[in-house]
């Protein structure tokens, strides 16, 4: 019986299809020549030089920073604070929590910059969530901005790990360089 098995393996036709493991294309993150600045009307942030701004509608501060190398978009939504700061924060937290259904967990990092009056939270949503990173920031008086990452690919956390690592750095850069127009001496 063992001899028959060895003979069968040696003379088996090679044209038999073998399933191949699922593969994912390699993502090449381009070098950042020098930071570019999104100068949306109510705020400005530094971002990777490969990203381009696409305004949405006519409301200032609404649009997407598009990252073509990974089919990623960071959707920015700016809203003026008009006595509704707690409602804006609640909405931002609710939108982040909605992704918890498909997530393996969520962590939050608080960001405070008193000199620029920037106070915010970065949400890291683990697993195969549609939006793995989100943030909001405010000056607690006049300005509120929210950002959410969307990558237009199947949300597989293993294959997207390098992209999520890149965007975690981008979101940190947004929070560290965010300035409100008219509040910090910028024109």
Where are these regions (language model features)?
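Short hydrophobic/glycine-rich mini-motifs in sensory/regulatory modules
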Residues: 140-146
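Beta-strand secondary-structure signal
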Residues: 122, 146-148
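Short beta-strand segments that buttress and anchor functional surface loops
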Residues: 120-127
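Hydrophobic/aromatic beta-strand elements that line small-molecule binding cavities or substrate pockets
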Residues: 109-110, 132-139
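N-terminal targeting sequences that direct proteins away from the cytosol to non-cytosolic compartments
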Residues: 1-72, 84-93, 101-110, 114-117, ...
């Amino acid at each position: 019986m063992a001899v028959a098995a060895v003979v069968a393996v040696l003379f088996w036709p090679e044209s038999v299809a073998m399933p191949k493991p699922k593969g994912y294309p390699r993502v090449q993150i381009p070098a950042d020549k020098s930071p570019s600045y999104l100068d949306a009307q109510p705020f400005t942030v530094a971002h990777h030089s490969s990203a381009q701004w696409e305004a949405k509608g006519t409301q200032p501060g609404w649009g997407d920073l598009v990252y073509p190398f990974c089919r990623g978009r960071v959707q920015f939504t700016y809203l003026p604070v008009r006595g509704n700061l707690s409602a804006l924060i609640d909405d931002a937290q609710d939108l982040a929590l909605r992704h918890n259904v498909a997530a393996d967990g969520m962590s939050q990092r608080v960001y405070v910059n008193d000199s620029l009056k920037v106070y915010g939270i970065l949400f890291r949503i683990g697993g195969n969530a549609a939006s793995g990173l989100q943030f909001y920031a405010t000056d607690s008086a006049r300005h509120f901005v929210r950002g959410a990452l969307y990558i237009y690919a199947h949300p597989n956390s293993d294959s997207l790990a390098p992209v999520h690592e890149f965007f975690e750095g981008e979101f940190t850069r947004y929070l560290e360089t965010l300035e409100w127009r008219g509040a910090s001496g910028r024109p």
